[in-house]
Amino acid sequence: MTILKEMEYTTEKTIEVIAKGEMLGFEWFVISYGTHPCCYIKIPEDHELFEVDYRDYYDNDIHINCHGGITYSANRLLDGLDDGWYIGWDYTHLGDYHAMIEPWGRKYPVSVLVADVTEVICDL
């Protein structure tokens, strides 16, 4: 596991990997978008969730316990990262900090974000 820097909340939209690692065969990334963080896990090709769109989870009785639920699945994440199948979730829900929407909301330190990723990977 590598924590590159702490989450710094801003009003400017930026994209920066602030933590990354590998656990139990899953690569993972915590990305700051400036206004909020998101967590992503790369799903291996031999895993049952590979290429399953997150919008189909309910119909397939797939439940992943993460902050606000899975809100992303795609075969690409960011320039400079290997293509593959990624799932992810964001921290911009009701009660979460967002400079332009909820400036009084909760801010998440990178240690909490990494702990959340670890829990999801253990559940996968």
List PLM regions with ranges.
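Acidic interaction surfaces
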Residues: 1-124
